[in-house]
A protein has these predicted regions:
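Extended catalytic cores of very large enzyme megasubunits
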Residues: 1-585
Length: 585
């Protein structure tokens, strides 16, 4: 045990980190003078403890034990008291674009500053008038942002990231859906460096179900510019998702219904989402919403559930917000204003599939559904108690005056791929894509095996190179291993082997407790029946999800290639470097 920055750290806890996690820490999160990941954990814990070293000690202990992990910017940009400017602890933002030249120009400037500061950005373009003889429509302006993403680097090699949101009723929606597809259309209007997302309304989904026509209306005048078959437009959206992974689908009416009453009374509204579709906060000409994230490790739930950690993390994230408010540059004034007014945080989770597998529970089971409900109800209850207590101690946030809360929102589940590596658990609330794969990042290549499967194989005396080679040859599957019981085969099914209605089922049931949203991916082998793909997407809307993130396919993927992100962008393969670093909650 050693005293460091006013708290006690344990260098022996480095042994809890995998080689991959240790490499990631040293290459991306530790400062030059830091000799151990423990010092980096301590730096972040103390930097945002608000002067309460007892809280800093507890936060350090939680992180160093792998019970939770800081979002990437919270950890990498935490100051160490030497007066140096390490950047901001928040790097995910939601913006709004108005239908006037001043707003368009202002948006370009804001995106530039957000990108320079390491931010990933989601932008809503639905109010920008469509293409006509007097207006170019929103896509040429998106093309400007597309170029900005290559101009403003974040770190040594990573470019900026931006997701554009457009309403399904917008006159330019058909071109927008395909602006990442490399073939067809004007290449000068393609936006390969952006991600696209469609705001899908309840009326549109009803029109799809009833097979009626759908009007595309100019947001400036409200008049119909074109009429299309709703089902044909929906089919184009799903086909683009199957080909490129996007557009994300944002069920905007569902999100708006769940905006807190206090904010609805203030006339606020949700217009879109963020880069990873888990943040659902109000935006406007005056507000750029911010995502203040970190994630608990569900695989260690039995260790931390009665520790008080969840309450401490809400307090900690409130401190992180305050640091952002105090130190963000004036160019981020809209983001600072939003953070000050609503103080929303997004405590997330990772390790859900690993938690189930550690208990031998199959994903496709009502036992899994019961565990899912229990976990997220507990996290929400503890978070709510914490924000009530903070309101008493520190005061209500301005948006929540009279409601007794310090933070308007508490929970949001981000992709958190890097955080899951550091904690040695499965990513986010996703099913594992493979039981064995080579994880390639700029930090190097690492073979990753499912530790719970490894335990099962060991119990059979089958933890051998030959067996693991057969798993790799089977694209990460264990269904061919005859010595495993059917219950074990069910527990170790991979994402592409699962019935995706269960992915949606679990997401829908936990959404009751997630005041913001979830980065929910769906997984379909190539050749999946289109009717089933449609069925899963319809279920997501009917069951009350706020959105769907990527549609992932098996095209070109093997157990060797599978990582934490299997996206298709302009038909090129990705490595895990291109996972949204801004949402590493």
């Amino acid at each position: 045990m050693t005293n460091y920055l006013g708290i006690t750290i344990d260098y022996e806890r480095d042994n809890r980190l995998s080689n991959q996690a240790d490499t990631l820490m040293r290459d991306y999160y530790m400062l030059d003078h830091e000799s151990s990941p423990q010092e980096a954990f301590a730096r972040a814990s103390v930097a945002y403890c608000g002067g309460d070293l007892d809280l800093g000690q507890r936060i350090y202990d939680y992180a160093s034990k792998g019970w939770f992990m800081f979002a990437s910017p919270v950890l990498s940009n935490a100051p160490d008291g030497d007066g140096g400017n390490r950047g901001l602890p928040i790097s995910c933002f939601l913006t709004y674009v108005g239908d006037n030249l001043d707003s368009l120009i202002d948006h370009n400037g804001e995106v530039a500053w957000l990108s320079v500061k390491g931010g990933g950005v989601g932008g809503h373009w639905g109010d920008v008038r469509g293409i006509s003889d007097k207006a170019p429509g929103p896509i040429p302006f998106m093309k400007v942002v597309d170029s900005q993403m290559t101009a403003y680097k974040q770190g040594k090699t990573r470019k900026g990231s931006y997701a554009a949101y457009l309403d399904v009723s917008h006159p330019d929606i058909e071109e927008f859906i395909s602006f990442k597809v490399p073939t067809g259309g004007d290449i000068n209007r393609k936006c390969f460096n952006l991600f696209n997302a469609v705001n899908v309304t309840d009326d549109f989904m009803e029109s799809v179900i009833n097979d009626t026509e759908w009007q595309l209306k100019d947001p400036n005048t409200g008049t119909a510019r074109n009429t299309v078959k709703a089902r044909e437009l929906w089919q184009r959206i799903l086909e683009a998702r199957f080909r490129t992974g996007s557009p994300y689908i944002n069920f905007i009416d569902t999100a708006r219904r769940h905006l807190p009453e206090a904010q609805r009374k203030l006339g606020l509204s949700i217009n879109g989402s963020n880069l990873c579709n888990e943040i659902h906060l109000a935006t406007s000409e005056e507000r750029t919403a911010v995502c203040c994230l970190s994630s608990v490790n569900l695989e260690r739930y039995d260790e931390w559930r009665a520790s008080g950690m969840v309450g401490d993390l809400i307090r900690f994230l409130d401190n992180v917000l305050q640091y952002f408010i105090d130190y963000a540059p004036e160019e981020l004034g809209k983001a600072v204003y939003s953070a000050y007014r609503e103080r929303s945080v997004g405590l997330g989770a990772m390790g859900f599939h690993g938690y189930l597998q550690s208990k031998g529970i199959a994903w496709e089971s009502w036992q899994a559904a019961s565990e899912n409900y229990k976990l997220f109800k507990d996290i929400k209850d503890q978070s709510t108690e914490a924000t009530y207590q903070l309101a008493v101690e520190r005061g209500e946030c301005p948006d929540g005056v009279g409601y007794g809360v310090r933070n308007m929102h508490l929970l949001a589940i981000a992709p958190n791929a890097n955080s899951s590596i550091l904690c040695g658990c499965s990513a986010s609330i996703e099913p594992r894509i493979s039981n064995c794969y080579v994880h390639r990042t700029r930090a190097g290549s690492h073979t990753v095996r499912n530790p719970y499967l490894e335990e099962a194989l060991e119990s059979y005396g089958q933890n051998t190179k030959k067996v693991w080679a057969s798993i790799i040859e089977s694209e990460g599957s264990v269904q061919h291993l005859e010595f495993l019981s059917q219950a074990e085969k069910d527990a170790f099914k991979t994402a592409f082997e699962l019935d995706q209605t269960w992915v949606v089922e679990h997401a829908a049931k936990r959404q009751e407790f997630i005041c913001q949203g979830q980065s929910v991916n769906v997984f379909f082998p190539s050749g999946t029946d289109k009717a089933f793909v449609n069925q899963v997407h319809l279920k997501a809307w009917k069951e009350g999800l706020k959105g769907l993130y990527y549609l992932r396919t098996t095209s070109g993927v093997t157990a060797e290639k599978v990582g934490t992100k299997v996206d298709r962008n302009a038909l090129k393969d990705f490595v895990d470097d291109e996972v949204c670093m801004s949402c590493q909650g």
